[in-house]
Design a protein with these regions (language model features):
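Catalytic metal-binding/acid-base residues of hydrolase active sites
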Residues: 34-39, 138
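Non-catalytic cell-wall polysaccharide-engagement segments
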Residues: 2-23, 59-178
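Conserved alpha-helical segments that form or flank metal/cofactor-binding pockets of metalloenzymes
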Residues: 37-71
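Histidine-centered catalytic micro-motifs used for acid/base chemistry in nuclease
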Residues: 31
Length: 178
């Protein structure tokens, strides 16, 4: 994934820097989240030699049929996989194709999760809070709260049970890129 993280640094870091201004989220966190959310798709598209603009236009994922869907559809949009079920207006606007707008939306989603945990778990601070917020980006704050009150890891309900752990690993690799 170093190759993908390098691409994220080269192509997405400028928009990430802009999107996180004034927020508590560091650049490496949003870069690592993009890698966790869409790194495999980025790698696939780079192997196909697709240009950046094309990748921005076609970055969709989480294809399947959820309860309530009439048929299979994409549920995640943009490098940060904004969920159509949670943010339909944003997705339908097409703003997910603009990396800056998509990253700003990801920051807004994280901030919603942060406010939830600051309200529901005022004793949660520092790295445990940041991991909870990050895990909630993947599986929802209710699931992470349920994990916490049952003394489980914040990633218990995340995809592959490792979302925030994987993001933290990608963060460390990203920080080491020159």
């Amino acid at each position: 994934m170093v190759y993908v993280l390098r691409w994220i640094k080269d192509y997405l870091e400028p928009v990430i820097i802009e999107a996180v201004k004034g927020s508590p989220y560091p650049v490496d966190q949003l870069a690592a989240m993009a890698c966790r959310e869409t790194g495999w798709k980025i790698e696939k598209y780079l192997n196909q030699k697709l240009p950046y603009a094309t990748i921005c236009e076609i970055m969709k994922g989480d294809y399947g049929q959820r309860a309530g869907d009439a048929e299979k559809i994409y549920h995640g949009f943009g490098f940060w996989q904004i969920d159509i079920g949670s943010y339909p207006e944003f997705v339908k606007s097409g703003n997910w194709k603009d990396p800056l707008k998509c990253c700003q939306m990801a920051v807004n989603v994280l901030e919603t999760k942060r406010k939830y945990f600051l309200n529901k778990t005022p004793g949660l601070k520092g790295d445990p809070l940041e991991r909870a917020v990050t895990a909630a980006y993947n599986c929802g704050e209710g699931n992470v709260f349920k994990a916490l009150i049952n003394h489980r890891d914040v990633d218990f309900y995340t995809f592959n049970h490792d979302y925030s752990k994987a993001v933290w690993g990608f963060r460390e690799t990203y920080k080491d890129l020159k």
